[in-house]
Amino acid sequence: MCGIVGAVAQRDVAEILVQGLRRLEYRGYDSAGVAVVDSDKQLTRLRRLGKVQELADAVEAAQVAGGTGIAHTRWATHGEPSEINAHPHISGDITVVHNGIIENHEMLRTMLQDRGYVFTSQTDTEVIAHLVEWELRSASSLLEAVQTTVKQLTGAYGTVVMDRNDPSRLVVARSGSPIVIGFGIGENFLASDQLALLNVTRRFMYLEEGDVAEMTRRDVRVFDALGQPVQREISESNLEHDAADKGHYRHYMQKEIFEQPKALINTMEGRITHDCVVVESIGVHAAEILAKVEHVQIVACGTSYNAGMTARYWFESLAGVSCDVEIASEFRYRKFVTRPNSLLITLSQSGETADTLAALRLAKEKGYMAAMTICNVAGSSLVRESDFAFMTRAGTEIGVASTKAFTTQLVTLLMLVTALGKQQQRIGRELEAEIVHALHQLPKQIETALSFEKQIETLAEDFADKHHTLFLGRGEYYPIAVEASLKLKEISYIHAEAYAAGELKHGPLALIDADMPVVVVAPSNELLEKLKSNIEEVRARGGLLYVFADEVAGFEADETMKIIAMPHVSEIVAPIYYTIPMQLLSYHVALIKGTDVDQPRNLAKAVTVE
């Protein structure tokens, strides 16, 4: 959720650190700070509440110099957003930044206070700084002091430690919060996300759970949780250097909405032919595993959970395999029964979602036949810890409100469903060809849906002064309605809820009045007539109806109901297609309201703490 950047170089690194923080702004934060030490052991620390730009201005004004440094953007967990609580934190000659939550910080704080340490902040991070300072008194090196310190910590952390008396190195530890090391020429870097470092290196190494690493200009040494030296794989990043550039778009979210046709094409490339799904593209042993699957368990959070809810309909109606979908933070604390030959699927854009990772680790102890992840970040923790990964190829998604990651997850899930049904001979060649044809057509159809932006922009004016909105859908369009309500509440701060339309009379009808917009997802399918009855229930109570309807569905607009006629598409991919106007609606409502579209208040892109 927070962002970390570190560097050891011959050149001044303050600008590199601040630029790295800029590239991590999408993760969400409330304050930022930087600390740099020079060859004369002079330490400069600057912290600011608010945007990274305020920190950048302070760094420029102070003319910060030095070749070793760490920087951080904070998203408050312990202690209010303030300059005092902002990182880095200092204890004597030790400076620390930290992502995560130290669960036993109160006990450690009491112990350290008994030793005479005075705390200046409300954060859990400050206990790390004091602990390292204490351990360094008897340790032979900073590395040893950090190794001893992390053994005393309970919780999640990605933490970097700098010693003013030894400006040639940084020591970093990782448990439950991602850290990547970037390799330069005569200089090395680290960050919580490789995106922060793409302007200085393309060669990266991800630390594993429990790793502690010592980084100098010329060398990186990694030790596992037992203190044994280990080698971790170094790989070349294929992320685009300009991924953090908005181009001509006003916001990252708008850019990412319009990148969806290309993202879907990239996600399908090499995985479908003109008439079939290439099962081998899912994984080396995918054909063998999918042939044995009797049950699918999907675990995810937020938007990824909504993608899983949509896929449940496909697994059961197309592939004939039972499927359960559960929120990761609930799944991991529930006593559950693992069904025979059950495949676990985790969904995550970042691959670092704390609850989803914890659910995966729990599930691996519970007898699932295999653990698969659908993820957008190669090298992430979910990818490394799963048995196999089916990657989305959405490209870097910076807007906090997920758009292209969601639709590429849906396309990936539909390809997986087709492969599973094919391997179990429940999807024949004719149906497989129909699904694949629909997938091939989808990018062009989404381009058509994007052309509705002006119409939806006008429609958005009706929502901007409302306090509540209700979304309705039936069948596989109910999760699409849920996702639409999530988008609206995330970025416009309008309270929005979604219901299966058949549930209206079981409570939500009590909310309907002339100030409650009701948005309906209305494709032409076997539930259309029942959906029309639900719409009439809203109409009879004076509700404001906005119906996104298939052009062949037979709706007619009047003073109580506005119709957005959507071109007819294959029923198989229609849930993906109807997502697009919902994204545009949320975006333009937020735009009218003047909210921070890309960085909504209180939210972060990657939720790496529980």
From Swiss-Prot:
Gene3D superfamilies with a match to the protein in the record: Glucose-6-phosphate isomerase like protein, domain 1, Glutamine Phosphoribosylpyrophosphate, subunit 1, domain 1
Keyword Cytoplasm: yes
Keywords: Aminotransferase, Cytoplasm, Glutamine amidotransferase, Repeat, Transferase
Protein's job: Catalyzes the first step in hexosamine metabolism, converting fructose-6P into glucosamine-6P using glutamine as a nitrogen source.
HAMAP family: GlmS
PANTHER family: GLUCOSAMINE--FRUCTOSE-6-PHOSPHATE AMINOTRANSFERASE, ISOMERIZING, GLUTAMINE--FRUCTOSE-6-PHOSPHATE TRANSAMINASE (ISOMERIZING)
Protein name (database record): Glutamine--fructose-6-phosphate aminotransferase [isomerizing]
Species this protein is from: Vibrio cholerae serotype O1 (strain ATCC 39315 / El Tor Inaba N16961)
Gene: glmS
